[in-house]
Amino acid sequence: MRVLFAGTPAVALPSLEALLAAGFDVVGVLTRPDAPIGRKRVLAPSPVAARAEELGLPIIRANRLDTEVQEQIALLRPEVAAIVAYGALVPPAALTIPDYGWINLHFSLLPAWRGAAPVQHAVINGDDVTGAVTFQLEAGLDTGPVFGTVTEFIRRDDTGSALLTRLSHSGSVLLTQTLSAVAAGTATAIEQTGPVSLAPKLTIEDGRIDFSVPALAVSRRIRGVTEEPGAWTVLAGQRFKVAAATLRPDRRELAPGQLAQAGKSLLVGTGSHAIELLAVQPAGKKMMDAADWLRGVGMVDGMVFGE
């Protein structure tokens, strides 16, 4: 089966590799254009583009599927398009180019968490279970009928990044199975049912920590936005990032945002009880263990996050 693969970030790579390993004829890759990365903002290809270059696959780089891009896709004569985190909408006119349309691998149990950041929202919301589905892409936002599902329990220490990595691998197997069924003529898609929730793309502001809410909600926020867009607060007027924390229900005397030292541990108060920060990044520094930051800063008495 001739497959156009549409994807951009590293999370899409397991699916590309799985399709190739299963013997699908990947006739081309659709990905976002090169983008600036790092502090020096050097232009670099997307992870999918970089891998496609290594494999010698034709690459279409586009932020939007205008008429010219649609013509490029049509020239590849794909029977189906597999899409995994491409990062842009597919217009109705492009949906009919492949014989079997576009089949999307989405990292939630639809119709829960439709949108660009389903895994992060699931962690922030405190969901116990999530998963991935393959579905037929249509004009609506993640509304198409579902071919298959895999489920994944959300662990108490899961970050959005770690959970997404696991789902990218289990989802790649599901995508391969779905396309195999489509090729064999045995695939069945079922309309979505159940409560709908939305998962819009997270902004930098979504990473701001509100220490006035209960500790569990603070922990979920930190885990959900790690690694993207990242959790942060303000200390002495400068941004202060947090990458890992754990609950400390034994310490309830701290006011929200108030810092305290307990041995080598860095504690901060919330709306219920303290949390212990494990990895932090002060302004202008690299990410470090909170204990190392404590040794460098000395006393934290009187310090309050958010000021």
Curated annotation (Swiss-Prot):
CDD domains named among the record's database cross-references: FMT_core_Met-tRNA-FMT_N, Met_tRNA_FMT_C
UniProt keywords, alphabetically: Protein biosynthesis, Transferase
Keyword Coiled coil: no
Gene Ontology cellular component list: cytosol
Chain's role: Attaches a formyl group to the free amino group of methionyl-tRNA(fMet). The formyl group appears to play a dual role in the initiator identity of N-formylmethionyl-tRNA by promoting its recognition by IF2 and preventing the misappropriation of this tRNA by the elongation apparatus.
Homology family: Belongs to the Fmt family.
Protein name (record): Methionyl-tRNA formyltransferase
Organism, scientific name: Renibacterium salmoninarum (strain ATCC 33209 / DSM 20767 / JCM 11484 / NBRC 15589 / NCIMB 2235)
Gene: fmt
